[in-house]
Amino acid sequence: HMKLDRICEKAKKYKLPIVIFTEGGGGRPGDTDITTSIAGLHVPTFALWGGLTGRCLRIAINNGFCFAGNAALFGCADIRIATKNSWIGMAGPAMIEGGGLGSYSPKEIGPSEVNEKNGVIDLVAKDEAEATDFAKKILSYFQGDLVDWKIEDQAQLKDIMPKNRKWSYPIRN
């Protein structure tokens, strides 16, 4: 939560758009960035994210399972893009079963074809690459007029982010 809180604060301060990839099952009891948490909902993350409404463009992309807090962030984005292989629900299998509502596999909860019909998903992509292309195109609509355009050397980025998207990396480098 602390990283996303910081991102939201910077986006608000500098009026920057945010593209968030929401795959995941939400918080876990063993999370260490919030030590006084019972349910994890008294953190500023969700209020900060919601507070960006009308200030910063928020685009959410999902590929795979997206439950709990991740689904809340996805649902509150201005534009929601999901792949055909997405399952999005406010509760995952453990919460549903723990609530006494039965046992379900993750693929039985919020499949993309249902969420598209319900209006949860704005754009359905065939895969994450196409979803990212959709986000890039949407961002281009909000950049305004460009008289002169420059970009820093992007080659250094290939060594900053790990090739496996599930690996951690030093965020302050």
Q: What residue spans do the PLM features occupy?
A:
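General structural signal for secondary-structure boundaries
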Residues: 1, 105, 127, 167-173
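Glycine-rich anion/phosphate-binding loops
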Residues: 1-9
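Conserved catalytic cores of soluble enzyme domains
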Residues: 16, 22-147
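Active-site phosphate/pyrophosphate-binding segments
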Residues: 132-173
